Amino acid sequence: MFIGDASILKPIQWCATEHPELPADIADWLMELGSMTRRFEQHCQRVHVEPQRECFITRDALGEEAEHLPVSQRYWLREIVLFGDNVPWLLGRTVIPEETLSGPDRALVDLGTLPLGRYLFSGDALTRDYIHVGRQDNLWARRSLLRLSGNPLLLTEVFLPASPLYTHCDSIPK
């Protein structure tokens, strides 16, 4: 697990969903409304997650993410690397206001190596407010404001070069 203040995610340049440089095959992945974990499972034998950082942080540590979440005394931060057949496919960062962590959803702080999608999409209490698309150098990224039983959480995903998102497109990152 990572100790310290640095995120595993480098800065991301966010753009409009209708960005003219967004190829249709990339948009199909980035605008996925279902579980990205399930989608990845269609392209490998085994998906697993390795947590890099799990801790409570203050609003000051959110940076521009604070614009997307309500004011809270603390936020649960989870940063992970998701692997498909032991190859890193995705960096994930989840920020959850403490108020979202009530009742059974308190389990979000104890996911460990369980992919977030397996928890979120196991019931019918999940909705998505929006998906923002962005770039981190040559890599595609997306950010979603999700609501679990009406309570918000912010999920940012960066698709690494070996990700199947790039398999059938002309913009494979170097």
Curated annotation (Swiss-Prot):
Cellular component annotations (GO), alphabetically ordered: cytosol
Protein name per Swiss-Prot or TrEMBL: Chorismate pyruvate-lyase
The protein's assembly and partners: Monomer.
EC number: 4.1.3.40
HAMAP family tied to this protein: UbiC
Protein task: Removes the pyruvyl group from chorismate, with concomitant aromatization of the ring, to provide 4-hydroxybenzoate (4HB) for the ubiquinone pathway.
UniProt keyword Cell membrane, yes or no: no
Pathway the protein acts in: Cofactor biosynthesis; ubiquinone biosynthesis
Catalytic activity: chorismate = 4-hydroxybenzoate + pyruvate
Gene name for this UniProt entry: ubiC
Binding annotation for substrate: M36, R78, L116, E157
Location of this chain's protein in the cell: Cytoplasm
Gene3D superfamilies: Chorismate lyase-like
Catalytic class of the enzyme: lyase
The species this protein was found in: Yersinia pestis
Protein family membership: Belongs to the UbiC family.
Pfam families on file: Chor_lyase (PF04345)
Alphabetical list of InterPro entries matching this protein: Chorismate--pyruvate_lyase, Chorismate_lyase_/UTRA_dom_sf
Keywords: Cytoplasm, Lyase, Pyruvate, Ubiquinone biosynthesis
Location (main, coarse): cytoplasm
Domain of life from the UniProt record: Bacteria
Biological processes annotated in GO: pyruvate biosynthetic process; ubiquinone biosynthetic process
GO function terms (MF aspect): chorismate lyase activity
